[in-house]
């Protein structure tokens, strides 16, 4: 039986932690930043975490991560 392919788009956006959860970056920080508050932009720099409902989908997209 052939190996399962890794979804390369997802592999570039998510990292798996030692506990098996996924971390990712936040959206909304690439352009149109002048109208966003400094506090909001600062909080968007922090790492986000994937919710449990979506982690199952990532497990299928990233079988070897």
From Swiss-Prot:
<comment type="similarity">
    <text>Belongs to the bacterial ribosomal protein bL35 family.</text>
</comment>
<dbReference type="GO" id="GO:0003735">
    <property type="term" value="F:structural constituent of ribosome"/>
</dbReference>
<dbReference type="InterPro" id="IPR021137">
    <property type="entry name" value="Ribosomal_bL35-like"/>
</dbReference>
<keyword id="KW-0687">Ribonucleoprotein</keyword>
<dbReference type="InterPro" id="IPR037229">
    <property type="entry name" value="Ribosomal_bL35_sf"/>
</dbReference>
<dbReference type="Pfam" id="PF01632">
    <property type="entry name" value="Ribosomal_L35p"/>
</dbReference>
<keyword id="KW-0689">Ribosomal protein</keyword>
<dbReference type="GO" id="GO:0022625">
    <property type="term" value="C:cytosolic large ribosomal subunit"/>
</dbReference>
<dbReference type="InterPro" id="IPR001706">
    <property type="entry name" value="Ribosomal_bL35"/>
</dbReference>
<protein>
    <recommendedName>
        <fullName>Large ribosomal subunit protein bL35</fullName>
    </recommendedName>
</protein>
<dbReference type="InterPro" id="IPR018265">
    <property type="entry name" value="Ribosomal_bL35_CS"/>
</dbReference>
<dbReference type="GO" id="GO:0006412">
    <property type="term" value="P:translation"/>
</dbReference>
């Amino acid at each position: 039986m052939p190996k399962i392919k890794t979804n390369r788009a997802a592999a570039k956006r998510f990292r798996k932690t030692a506990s098996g959860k996924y971390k990712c970056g936040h959206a909304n920080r690439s352009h149109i930043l002048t109208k966003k508050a400094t506090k909001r932009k600062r909080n968007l720099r922090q790492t986000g975490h994937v919710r449990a409902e979506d982690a199952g989908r990532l497990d299928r997209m990233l079988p070897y991560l």
